[in-house]
């Protein structure tokens, strides 16, 4: 496989909010592997919008005003990707933590697992990995396994490949970054296969890091969301998964 794909079915979506220091390099790195790039500017106020304008001949820009959260930005990106005729999208964060040279790892799964969501699993022991992120990820992994029966290594990774058709009809409760967890849970209940591929991750030193994660507030939001998802699992998710299992037995 060539290092760069011109697969007309696939694009890369980059949601961004105030990433002026990293967005240009992320875009240029991604374009080495995929020529179709959609950047969703989620109400940036720091010069990111001007930086994207200078790249407008290389990318498709979707602008959301005001800032609505990562989940809102992803939904806008998925909508644009479907409008442009794509069937699959890779999502990658704009802060530079993901390596574009891992894109071929996702592409290598596309033909044999076209109906699956593929999650890039990070090494959570990497240098400079925030301790709060490690705890939050393990916490999220536990609840995801309880809600779906699926053991996934990194439920909070934003580096993913989505089959866009599998996202149709999946309503979201939240619009912030925890919406990525919702997408996985609802997709699992709908029968979409979900598995991981290992990816690299880079976390800059704390004094250079741009983070929109608010430990106490966001932990409370995630806890409330998981409570709601557990209730939904009892009254809907488990029943739907059980019905599929019965159909497979008698198929």
Where are these regions (language model features)?
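Acidic helix N-cap motif at the loop->helix transition within catalytic regions
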Residues: 21-25, 46-54
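A conserved acidic beta->alpha catalytic loop
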Residues: 41-50, 96
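Short hydrophobic beta-strand elements that form part
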Residues: 11-15, 38, 63
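Hydrophobic helical membrane-anchoring modules
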Residues: 1-7, 149, 172-251
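Acceptor/aglycone-binding surface of glycosyltransferases and processive sugar-polymer synthases
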Residues: 65-83, 88, 100-177, 204-223
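Short, well-formed alpha-helical segments that are part of the catalytic scaffolds
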Residues: 17-32
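Cell-envelope/extracellular polymer assembly enzymes that use nucleotide-activated donors
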Residues: 9-11, 36, 182
């Amino acid at each position: 496989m060539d290092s760069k794909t011109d697969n007309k079915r696939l694009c890369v979506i980059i949601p961004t909010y105030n990433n002026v220091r990293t967005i240009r390099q992320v875009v240029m790195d991604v374009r080495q592997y995929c020529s179709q790039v959609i950047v969703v500017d989620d109400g940036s106020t720091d010069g990111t919008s001007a930086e994207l304008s200078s790249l407008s001949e290389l990318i498709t820009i979707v602008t959301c005003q005001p800032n609505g959260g990562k989940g809102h930005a992803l939904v806008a990106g998925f909508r644009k990707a479907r409008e442009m005729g794509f069937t699959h999208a890779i999502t990658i964060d704009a802060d530079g933590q993901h390596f574009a040279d891992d894109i071929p790892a996702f592409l290598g799964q596309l033909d044999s697992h076209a109906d699956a969501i593929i999650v890039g699993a990070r090494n959570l022991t990497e240098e400079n990995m925030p301790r709060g992120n490690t705890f939050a990820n393990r916490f999220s992994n536990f609840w995801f396994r309880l809600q779906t029966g699926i053991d996934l290594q990194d439920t909070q990774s934003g580096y993913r490949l989505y089959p866009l058709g599998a996202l149709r009809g999946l309503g979201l409760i939240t619009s912030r970054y925890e919406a990525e967890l919702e997408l996985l849970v609802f997709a699992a209940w709908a029968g979409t296969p979900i598995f991981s591929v290992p990816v690299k991750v880079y976390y800059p030193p704390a004094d250079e890091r741009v983070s929109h994660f608010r430990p106490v507030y966001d932990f409370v939001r995630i806890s409330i969301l998981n409570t709601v998802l557990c209730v939904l699992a009892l009254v809907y998710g488990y029943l739907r998964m059980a019905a599929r299992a019965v159909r497979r037995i008698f198929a």
